[in-house]
Amino acid sequence: MGLTIDDQLAIQQLAARYNHAIDSGDSAAFAGAFVDDGVLDAGQLQVEGRTALEQFGQQFHTSARAPRHVATNLVIDGHGDKATLQAYVQMYALAGDPPRQEITASGKYTDTLAKVDGNWRFVRRTFTVDA
């Protein structure tokens, strides 16, 4: 059996809350979007485990000026307590002088997820930069 509508909506909410958490500097919520041994894979950057993810969230927020992650075209598949998510993403941040919002990264998320204790979490979130 495929995912229920409730599961699909919960996964969409997870993706949205992840973006809000990383953009607002809520590193605990950012890390909480992952399973305990979850992995953020951004090519040469590999972050694994809740503590490392939380530290990354703190570092990212202090280095980016007014970041905004925008994910679109979400495609969710799966069954039971396992799922995959694919989405396009653009990141905006203040840049230049005078500062203005600019696209600073563009690419694709390819994710594996698991439902743990009734809540969906990222097992692995892979970000591939557009070439």
Regions found by a protein language model. Give the residues of each.
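Short, low-complexity N-terminal intrinsically disordered segments enriched in polar/charged residues
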Residues: 1-28, 32-36
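Short beta-strand edge/turn micro-motifs at domain boundaries
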Residues: 84, 106-131
